[in-house]
Amino acid sequence: MTTTAERTDAPVRTDVRPGARRAFAILTGIATLFVFVQFFTSSEFIRSEGPSGETWTDIHGWTAYGLLAPALVAAVIALAALRRAAPVLTVLSVVLVVASVGQWGSGHLISTYHLDGWTAFHVFFSSVVLALAVWISVRSALIRRRG
């Protein structure tokens, strides 16, 4: 039986270009940063009323693209360059994009079409996106340092 302290991760394959590992780590870090920006802006528009609340809602909507774009590019890099070296990370990168699109879409259903029933779904996806983004970001940094 191995404990957490005894367990070691599988080595990173050396045939993965350092540039791919670095780009993936940077992009997942940027996506994670925008997840936190999303949380900040959501707390601001929930607290604000009137024009100020609408402004924060607009900012919240636009910063979603700051999450989606780097997450999508990171998933493409993972599929192209990291899938054999880090298969779990690759799959979770794709799941992050899918969850982010679900969060983005539900946000638009709420803000554009005023379908407030989607709020619980949107909040659930935000938790999934946060957990995935942080985990992927930490793991990508570890892979980059080991490689």
Question: What residue ranges belong to the model's regions?
Answer:
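Polytopic transmembrane helical bundles with strong interfacial aromatic enrichment
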Residues: 2-147
